[in-house]
Amino acid sequence: PLYPASVKPIKGRVILVEGIFDMVNLFDKGLSNAICCFGTNNVNEDKLSILKMQDIMGVDIIFDGDDAGQKAAENVRFLAERVGLITRNVNLGQNIDPGSLAEQQVKNLKEKLYD
C-alpha cells in the first residue's frame, strides 16, 4: 500500500518516497504531503490510481540518488503518467537519501517544489 492512505496535497501534489523513515523525516520537518511506497517494487498502476481518485494531480518522486533509486523513479514515473498523474523526478544527488535530510534542506526543498 501507499502510506498514509490519505494525505493533504500541497498545490495538488504529493511526494512519493521509498521508505517509512524517508516519509517520517520529510513530514516531521514540514513536508506534510509525503507518502511512502514501502520499496520501489510495491508500486503499480492500481495503487497510483487511488491518488487520482483523491483528486491528487501530481506526484513528486523522491527516491534515493543512487543508480538503482533513479531507475526505480523512472519506472514509477512511467506508471504514474499512465494513470494521468503529472510527475516530477526530484533527484537529490548521488548517495543522498530523503530520510537523512536536515531541517533546512527540507525547507529548501519545499520552497523549490511549491513556491
Language-model features: where?
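Phosphate-handling DNA/RNA-contact segment within nucleic-acid enzymes
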Residues: 1-55, 72-73
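Acidic beta-strand-to-loop metal/phosphate-binding motif
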Residues: 16, 54-68, 90-91
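Short secondary-structure boundary/capping segments
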Residues: 30-32, 76-78, 105
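Acidic, metal-coordinating catalytic cores used for nucleic-acid/nucleotide bond scission
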Residues: 40-44, 63-73, 94-97
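Short, aromatic/basic amphipathic alpha-helical patches
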Residues: 71-81
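Short acidic, glycine/proline-enriched helix-loop-strand junctions
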Residues: 82-87
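C-terminal or mid-to-C-terminal helical accessory/interaction module adjacent to the motor/catalytic core
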Residues: 89-97, 101-115
